[in-house]
């Protein structure tokens, strides 16, 4: 079997960073958005032209309602795949390094135990312990080493040999574990071994992601590690104009990263096809199912040849994800990093404070004063709230109190969301207020603190929220405000805290014992103060106004 197809021949037309052509951050913003510049690109459009920009209404390109999601893909016809007549393709590239071959199974099992790796399936390859052992081509390894990583992460050590072997793979690992590179680097090798794209061909590699933020981040990784090659890629997601995305697809791209709704829109309108896809990635599969994308995922996969290689990545392994894997993966091998039971990252210090709604603002300020005490610490704080209105209220309150906070939620236009995320990533605005939906897929490294201003609906969302900190081996702190309104969640929260060997507030323990009714009067009644206690605050529909409020008497 040949190794890597004998060098990189490209795909014609040169490498392009299509996201920049879609507008990037360069258009400027105007009016109530509070940004200087303005004119051109997305910033000059009125907010109505984005169809709400949300996850229900945004996928159709901005001018069609959220209920269109229900009918997405109804016009797609399932191809009649005849494997006997389909062109053959190469998908097995792994050649075990002599060092790996020489390791005994006892040594392999010790490595897996030390790194919390468990595997299942037939003939799972041994893990690699160094980048050189993975056997990637020189042009890939040069980019990896340039990033300064000391060694592969656990998911990479086991996942690279699995992906390079051409097998279908399931990977269960927390976000921030390095899984994006686990499938991106083998994707580059896979593309290198395929025939060049012909006019009218669709992509060779398709990556499906739940949100546009995650899709853009995946593209940035592919850009980074494909810099020395000539792989072309594009990012397809809703909430922005279709024109630049259509142009990219029609020019030809080897890699397409997409959210399900916008991709189906492109397929139905004939702007692209999936006939050439031989490497399929489902990233954050559990989140895609949580967000109701299962029908769209099934329709998309029906458009791809059945002998493709499929890699499914998920932070959790619930029944719905298992069913999807059983339906669309063949003889798959599986790698799990850590426990399959839902559990919090043990590197995160969890602090839960039982307080009333009316105490939240003052308590938030006290924590921010400690967190942001020194500019040298480069701390970043992500604040989770329950609604878009509270996100705007909190942001306005913090900015008026001198804190450089910005908010992100589903009603924000895409260009503003990109700008806010960039400000947070770079530390120019080290405090970000977010709702759950807007935060999904956001992968910002070095978040030191998470504050749950409003407690989420369940312990799974709690674990996902606090998992934004403590990534890639770092430590983190999660602070949670818990009120009588959340009493029904007390028992589950206590279980999470005890499993992670965290301190449990005696009041929370007592609440867990009496948590049958939610909001027991023994804790006082703070009912009716939902939305964070902002009785006199802004109550209109969420706009960009909160991010435009001047920061008064900066406290940081």
From Swiss-Prot:
Q: What is this protein called?
A: ATP-dependent RNA helicase DBP2
Q: Where is this region: Disordered?
A: 534-556
Q: Where is the Helicase ATP-binding domain?
A: 160-335
Q: Which gene encodes it?
A: DBP2
What the entry lists under SUPFAM superfamilies is as follows: P-loop containing nucleoside triphosphate hydrolases
Provide this UniProt record's keywords sorted from A to Z.
ATP-binding, Cytoplasm, Helicase, Hydrolase, Nonsense-mediated mRNA decay, Nucleotide-binding, Nucleus, Ribosome biogenesis, RNA-binding, rRNA processing
Superkingdom to which the source organism belongs: Eukaryota
Task: Name the major location.
Answer: cytoplasm
């Amino acid at each position: 079997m040949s190794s890597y197809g004998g060098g990189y021949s490209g795909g014609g037309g040169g490498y392009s960073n299509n996201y920049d052509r879609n507008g990037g951050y360069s258009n400027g913003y105007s009016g109530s958005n509070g940004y200087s510049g303005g004119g051109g690109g997305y910033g000059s459009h009125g907010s109505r032209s984005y169809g709400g920009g949300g996850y229900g209404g945004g996928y159709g390109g901005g001018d069609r309602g959220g209920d269109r999601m229900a009918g997405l893909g109804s016009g797609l016809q399932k191809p009649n795949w005849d494997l006997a007549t389909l062109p053959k393709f190469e998908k097995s590239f792994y050649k075990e390094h002599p060092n790996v071959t020489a390791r005994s199974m006892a040594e392999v099992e010790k490595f897996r135990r030390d790194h919390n790796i468990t595997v299942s399936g037939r003939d799972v390859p041994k893990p690699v312990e160094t980048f050189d052992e993975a056997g990637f081509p020189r042009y890939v390894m040069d980019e990896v080493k340039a990033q300064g990583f000391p060694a592969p992460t656990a998911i990479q050590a086991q996942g690279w040999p699995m992906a390079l072997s051409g097998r279908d793979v399931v990977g269960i690992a927390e976000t921030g574990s390095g899984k994006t590179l686990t499938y991106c680097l083998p994707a580059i090798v896979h593309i290198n071994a395929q025939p060049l794209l012909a006019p009218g061909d669709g992509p060779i590699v398709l990556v499906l992601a739940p949100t546009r933020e995650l899709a853009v981040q995946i593209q940035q990784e592919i850009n980074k590690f494909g810099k020395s090659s000539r792989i072309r890629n594009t990012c397809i997601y809703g909430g922005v104009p279709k024109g630049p995305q259509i142009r990219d697809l029609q020019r030809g791209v080897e890699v397409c990263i997409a959210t399900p709704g916008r991709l189906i829109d492109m397929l139905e309108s004939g702007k692209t096809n999936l006939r050439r896809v031989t490497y399929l990635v489902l990233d954050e599969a559990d989140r895609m199912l949580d967000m109701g994308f299962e029908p769209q995922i099934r329709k998309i996969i029906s458009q791809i040849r059945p002998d493709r290689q499929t890699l499914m990545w998920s932070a959790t392994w619930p029944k719905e994800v298992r069913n999807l894997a059983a339906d669309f993966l063949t003889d798959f091998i599986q790698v799990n990093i850590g426990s399959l039971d839902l559990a919090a990252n043990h590197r995160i210090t969890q602090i839960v404070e039982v307080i009333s709604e009316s105490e939240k603002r003052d308590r938030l300020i006290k924590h921010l004063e400690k967190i942001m005490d020194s500019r040298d610490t480069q701390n970043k704080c992500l604040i989770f709230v329950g609604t878009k209105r509270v996100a705007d209220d909190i942001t306005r309150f913090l900015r008026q109190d001198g804190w450089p906070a910005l908010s992100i939620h589903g009603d924000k236009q895409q260009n503003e969301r990109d700008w806010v995320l960039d400000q947070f990533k770079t530390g120019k605005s080290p405090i970000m207020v977010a709702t759950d939906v807007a935060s999904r897929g956001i992968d910002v490294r070095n978040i030191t603190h998470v504050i749950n201003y409003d407690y989420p609906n369940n312990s799974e969302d709690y674990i996902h929220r606090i998992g934004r900190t403590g990534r890639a081996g770092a430590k983190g702190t999660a602070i949670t405000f818990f009120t009588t309104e959340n009493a029904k969640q007390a028992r589950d929260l206590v279980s999470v805290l005890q499993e992670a060997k965290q301190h449990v507030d005696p009041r929370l323990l007592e609440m867990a014992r009496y948590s049958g009714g939610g909001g027991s009067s023994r804790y006082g009644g703070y009912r009716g103060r939902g939305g964070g206690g902002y009785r006199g605050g802004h109550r209109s529909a969420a706009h960009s106004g909160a991010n435009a409020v001047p920061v008064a008497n900066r406290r940081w």
